[in-house]
Amino acid sequence: MSRIRIRLRLTPHLEEMLREVPHRLDLVVPAGTTVRGLLQEAGIPPLAVYTVIQGRSVLDKDDALSNDTELTLLAPVAGG
């Protein structure tokens, strides 16, 4: 099974929420790993991430990753 390299970038708000997680992570995972599985592998609770961005696309947490890429993770926005 082939492996892919994924770079995760946390936005400042998410970085503040997840202080124990570095703001940039490089992970090597099997091709076909879902976004949700990647987050769990990185120690990031999937519910803490509202949006996952790849380039100009928004990914669903059930989307499978097949190529080396960089993902930006956004936290939920609080407000009233």
Give the label of every model feature segment:
Residues 1-79:
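Ubiquitin-like/PB1-type beta-grasp interaction modules and other compact soluble beta-rich domains
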